[in-house]
Amino acid sequence: MSQVTFSDVAIDFSHEEWACLDSAQRDLYKDVMVQNYENLVSVGLSVTKPYVIMLLEDGKEPWMMEKKLSKAYPFPLSHSVPASVNFGFSALFEHCSEVTEIFELSELCVFWVLHFLSNSPNSTVEAFSRSKKKKKKKKKRQCFAFLIYFRLGIKMGKQGIINKEGYLYEDSPQPVTMEKVVKQSYEFSNSNKNLEYTECDTFRSTFHSKSTLSEPQNNSAEGNSHKYDILKKNLSKKSVIKSERINGGKKLLNSNKSGAAFNQSKSLTLPQTCNREKIYTCSECGKAFGKQSILSRHWRIHTGEKPYECRECGKTFSHGSSLTRHQISHSGEKPYKCIECGKAFSHGSSLTNHQSTHTGEKPYECMNCGKSFSRVSLLIQHLRIHTQEKRYECRICGKAFIHSSSLIHHQKSHTGEKPYECRECGKAFCCSSHLTQHQRIHSMKKKYECNKCLKVFSSFSFLVQHQSIHTEEKPFEV
């Protein structure tokens, strides 16, 4: 089952869109983005810190990333297999055996993508619409080009470019439904059933900054000459934003079936981070990271370390940003108010979560059982039920738990701590849920009272039986 990524819950704003937001809406956006990232980090689903999070933590505006990121120039890919053949990503490794890890931004032909979409009917995608720009001198037929982001994709190929005839388009990104993309793709396939596709020669996406793309060299081991028509167009700014994720230690994707390679001249400068190996590996779960600092933050998931302590209440946190958000609760300030019921919240993300109770919207659906959730964090917690993953282990007895809250409750059994005391009888409990359950005993005792003798019963049926004594009725007499 595919994992949730930060991009599944991320929202991108252009400079113009950001300018339309007021200060409260911007604060809400920042809170939601940071909380979603921390939720993913807490369960080990986010490997590198997204650039937008770094900007937000530095107090910068998120649209500034558009200026920093590099431009992308993918080149075409095609296949000789007809559309009726069932493609899968296993076939990709047959064509490109050296593949060890695929970029989140990679190039796919139309049939690869159609197969992937058909096997992920619940995925949501973002696509680039067809460009209206056409070169007058070139009469080559220009096709659709979609930059697809697979919301619930597999670990490899989470993003891809559909290039049906080997040409790339540039236009403003428009979010569309998967159904619309599939419909357009199938319309193209049905109207071009007799098209011939050449064998897969290469599968590579490369990114560079302030440079031009050189023509690939024809160094095929089979001696075949391959001519690549590359449109030197820039992806729109939002697509460039997506390409930022390659700078987190991802490996370049190479193919040994073709000798085609980019000319390593001054005209092409690749970021060093693209070729960097993931050398920092977690000894507990085997996950690899590009930076020692990221591994250190990840390690806190296993150790339970919470180095950031609140001076007001002593509560500890694993991340500094979590402590900052927590400290707002002590100030008593609640600037985020629900327009439906008037309830106020100290964090914008809390308001967002609360508003789902009014709308009833549950957009996050479990692929295993179909259960839906209003928040992605709830879905992540639920998924552990299916995987039976128990990542929270007690250091004292070794017992493992699915949820961190269960571990916290369990640890109190070792310490003997019972902070929850009943006001009625003084009995103490280690968990608030146990106290709530106990308090029902007191409330039930005072619930049903006989108006004749003032005797109290814990249930209505007992009261009815008792009242038969006063009326001299014998309801159970044969």
From Swiss-Prot:
Function according to Swiss-Prot or TrEMBL: May be involved in transcriptional regulation.
Pfam families, per the entry: KRAB (PF01352), zf-C2H2 (PF00096)
GO BP terms: regulation of transcription by RNA polymerase II
Organism ancestry: Eukaryota, Metazoa, Chordata, Craniata, Vertebrata
Gene3D superfamilies, alphabetized: 6.10.140.140, Classic Zinc Finger
Family matches, as CDD domains: KRAB_A-box (cd07765)
Species annotation: Homo sapiens (Human)
Highest taxon of source: Eukaryota
Ranges annotated as C2H2-type zinc finger: 280-302, 308-330, 336-358, 364-386, 392-414, 420-442, 448-470
A GO cellular-component term linked to this record: nucleus
Name under which the protein is recorded: Zinc finger protein 302
Annotated KRAB domain residues: 4-75
Family matches, as InterPro entries: KRAB, KRAB_dom_sf, Znf_C2H2_sf, Znf_C2H2_type
